[in-house]
From Swiss-Prot:
Places the protein is found: Cytoplasm; Nucleus
Keyword Nucleus: yes
Protein role: Non-catalytic component of the proteasome, a multicatalytic proteinase complex which is characterized by its ability to cleave peptides with Arg, Phe, Tyr, Leu, and Glu adjacent to the leaving group at neutral or slightly basic pH. The proteasome has an ATP-dependent proteolytic activity.
Keyword Cytoplasm recorded: yes
Organism in which the protein naturally occurs: Caenorhabditis elegans
CDD domains in the record: proteasome_beta_type_2 (cd03758)
Protein name according to UniProt: Proteasome subunit beta type-2
Length: 199
């Protein structure tokens, strides 16, 4: 039912997550659920899945990466965070405490001087450094749009317009009513929260 969108160029990454909470698979219980977990100053994670798993895994990941930065005096890079999340989910699969979550990780790597976008699913399949990614059923409607219209040198305005086009297509074609999306952008200057996309 949920939907995550990620678009990346060399200069920025845009992430959007729906704000809905569904109960019993079909009842809209809440339209203000925040699925974002800030992992650093220029690093964030959007997480969907079983509600309890999302809350526990998201908070656990956030606190572990904060602890790492306190102990070592620096934050992990986006690609390191991606590997940490993938390994954590993979280790959970081999125990009784596995997490049924799908995540998008976006950030800006100051060392490599470029944006990062990656994903990990609930089976610990990881995709790193991708131009665009989706999680959730609605993504099936959007890959064709991206294949046709994505350009690696898009401006922020063009990237946001493309993201809005994908969200609009999901709204038009998906059976569930997803009332709004939280949108963030990360670039060299840092993290910014943009206005929510509401319907």
């Amino acid at each position: 039912m949920h939907f995550l969108v990620g678009i990346s160029t060399e200069n920025y990454v845009i992430l959007a997550a729906d704000k809905a909470t569904f109960a019993y698979g079909a009842i809209l219980a809440d339209s203000e659920n925040d699925k974002e977990y800030r992992l650093g100053k220029k690093l964030t994670m959007m997480c969907i899945g079983e509600e309890g798993d999302v809350a526990q895994f998201g908070d656990w990941t956030k606190r572990n990466l904060q602890l790492y930065s306190v102990r070592n005096g620096y934050e992990v890079s986006p690609s390191c965070a991606h590997h940490f999340v993938r390994r954590s989910i993979a280790e959970g699969l081999r125990s009784q405490d596995h997490y049924t979550v799908d995540v998008l990780i976006g950030g800006y790597d100051d060392k490599e001087d470029k944006a990062f976008l990656g994903s990990v699913d609930y089976l610990a399949n990881g995709l790193g450094q991708q131009p665009y990614l989706f999680r959730g059923f609605c993504g099936r409607f959007c890959y064709a749009i991206m294949d046709r219209e994505y350009k690696k040198d898009m401006t922020e305005a063009e990237g946001l317009a493309l993201m809005n086009k994908c969200i609009g297509e999901a709204k038009r074609r998906f059976v569930a009513n997803i009332p709004g999306y939280k949108v963030v952008i990360i670039d060299k200057k840092g993290y910014r929260k943009l206005d929510d996309v509401l319907f």
